[in-house]
Curated annotation (Swiss-Prot):
It is an enzyme of class 2 (transferase). This is Alpha-tubulin N-acetyltransferase. Specifically acetylates 'Lys-40' in alpha-tubulin on the lumenal side of microtubules. Promotes microtubule destabilization and accelerates microtubule dynamics; this activity may be independent of acetylation activity. Acetylates alpha-tubulin with a slow enzymatic rate, due to a catalytic site that is not optimized for acetyl transfer. Enters the microtubule through each end and diffuses quickly throughout the lumen of microtubules. GO terms for cellular component: microtubule. Belongs to the acetyltransferase ATAT1 family. SUPFAM superfamilies: Acyl-CoA N-acyltransferases (Nat). It comes from Giardia intestinalis (strain ATCC 50803 / WB clone C6) (Giardia lamblia).
Length: 362
């Protein structure tokens, strides 16, 4: 689709490639550049509306700027070839057993390639760019009102089919519904989001699919991005990848899900102090909570509530780490109490369980 201006130049490209737009990148643009981008996004939004038969456009500059959604665009000099909009949505989904699962899932909210450039790998390149940005395979996404063309694309490229109709018009694989539902139950306890390992993609540089690229070259179609468990029997490299069952996916572990407002990073995190204490055998009454905090955090990073500073003779200088807020201290006190009781009963190793919060595992 042409707009009477150099589309690539409006997004900072020399000729062609894939660009990523977020609310932050739009707000940082000069006003003159925002006007050009607004014309392009409004035009592509109307094209998507007409192609999908929607009553109104669902993609525009205002929608991206005023939300935490993000948008990928494939551009070639003075043309915009396609768009892919994504973001996290709070959903209620039904699995194959008609059980309801609450979740915060990664969603494909709008997908459109211009009619003149379809079947040239543009859609595959856009999907791959979003996968690298979110580190989540498309097999773990939910799709908002997918068109017949999108369903055919998912079946061909990702071997995704047999979706169950949902009241909210989002479609998702049954295994994904169960996995994200289990993740949200754990989120209610730990307040940490997780990506199921079955849909986690490894850390990869995005430069292959973002920025300058030759879009006339056909992108290699990948049949599956799901993680296949290693078996003892060796398989031929040419053999087709077997799709995981729901039970196999549910048996896999999880890693921390980063926020959607920035590019994900999954650094290793140390074991929590509460879990470390629970793994220790305590003889007798054991140390006090204040001594326990000093042993694990150190005197300089120990936060001392104002009501006990005088009685314990702590100086104001000992409060130096801002992120150790009072709420975390209260949670540590609760964990300390439970761990001491468990140690007193002699069953420390049975109490560690799911309470350990860690980074990338596996």
């Amino acid at each position: 689709m042409q707009f009477g201006c150099n589309v690539a130049e409006a997004f900072g490209l020399r000729r062609s490639g894939v660009v990523l737009l977020t609310d932050q990148s739009l707000r940082s643009m000069p006003l003159s550049q925002q006007k050009k981008v607004e014309i392009i996004l409004d035009g592509m939004g109307r094209g998507s509306q007409a192609a999908q038969g929607l009553p109104s456009p669902i993609t525009s500059l205002a929608f991206i700027r005023d939300s935490h959604h993000f948008l990928f665009l494939a551009v070639d000099e003075d043309q915009c070839l396609g768009i892919l909009k994504g973001g996290i949505k709070h959903l209620f989904m039904l699995d194959s057993q008609n059980e309801t699962h609450e979740m915060d899932a990664m969603c494909c909210l709008d997908f459109y390639t211009h009619e003149t450039v379809q079947r040239r790998g543009i859609g595959t390149r856009l999907f791959r760019a979003m996968e690298l940005h979110t580190h989540i395979s498309a097999q773990g996404w939910a799709f908002d009102r997918p068109s017949p063309k999108l369903l055919a694309f998912l079946s061909k490229v990702y071997d995704m089919h047999d979706f169950k109709a949902q009241p909210n018009n989002f479609l998702m694989l049954d295994a994904s519904i169960r996995l994200w539902g289990a993740e949200f139950k754990q989120y209610r306890r730990s307040k940490k989001h997780y990506i199921p390992d079955a849909y986690l993609l490894p850390e990869t540089r995005e430069s292959e699919y973002l920025g300058e690229a030759e879009l006339t070259k056909r992108t290699l179609i990948r049949k599956s991005t799901a993680v296949i468990p290693q078996t003892k029997t060796t398989q031929s490299e040419d053999a087709p990848a077997r799709a995981l069952t729901a039970d196999e996916l549910l048996s896999k572990r999880s890693v921390v899900l980063p926020t959607a407002s920035r590019t994900p990073s999954l650094p290793d995190q140390p074991q929590s102090v509460a879990a470390a204490y629970m793994n220790k055998r305590i003889e007798g009454a054991g140390p006090s909570f204040e001594q326990y905090m000093r042993d694990h955090y150190g005197a300089k990073s120990l936060i001392v509530p104002s009501e006990i500073q005088t009685s314990l003779n702590h100086s104001k200088d000992s409060v130096s780490q801002e992120d150790m807020i009072q709420r975390q201290r209260q949670l540590d006190r609760m964990a300390f109490t439970l761990a001491r009781e468990a140690n007193a009963r002699g069953s420390i190793h049975n109490t560690v369980g799911r309470g350990v919060i860690c980074g990338r595992r596996g």
